[in-house]
C-alpha cells in the first residue's frame, strides 16, 4: 500500500488542461463577464463547477502526482514538504482544500510521517482523511491509521480500527470477502489482543481468518497462530 500511487494524472488529461488554462488566460475578461451573467441567472453553481472547481482539481492532481513520485522513491521528507519546484503533500492538502487530491494528500502526509516514525503526526493526518466507498484505498488508509495507533500505544483503538479496516474492505468486495487486505488487518488485531493476553478473543479472529479467507496468502500460516493461542 505504502508505495502505491493512489491518484495519477494521465498525459492526455494534463495536455487538455494546459490548453484550457491558456484559453482562459487569453480571454479572461470576456469569460469573467459571461460568468458574472451566468451567476445572476443560475446562482453560480454551474459556473463554479465548470470554470473553477474543475481546473482547480486538475491543478491539485498535478501537484499531487509530483509529490507521489518523491514518495515512490522513498524521499518522504521531500514528498511531505516539497522543494523549490514541487508542492509537497502538506501544501497540496492546505492549498487545495475541498478537492479529492487534497484528501489523498492528507493520507499521503500521514504515510510519510509513519515512514519517518513520527506516529503522532501520522495519526493526525490519517484521521483527517475522508474515507470513500471504495474497496482498497480507504480500507488501506484506515489500516495505516490502526498501525499508527498501535505505535502510539493506543492498543484498544488500534484493534478496533484494524477490525474496521477489514469490514470496510469486505463490504465492497465480491461476496464480501477481500482476500487482499482483510486477513492481514484481522491478524494484526488478533496479535495485539495476544499482547494484552486476550487469547480467547484472538483465537476467534484467527478462526475467522481460516474459515472465511481460504484463498488468502495471509491465511497460509494461520494454523500456527491458532495453535499458539490454544495452548
Describe the predicted segments one by one.
Residues 54, 93-102, 116, 131-138, ...:
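Short solvent-exposed coil/turn linkers within tandem alpha-helical repeat scaffolds
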Residues 1-37:
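N-terminal positive-inside, membrane-proximal cytosolic segments immediately preceding the first
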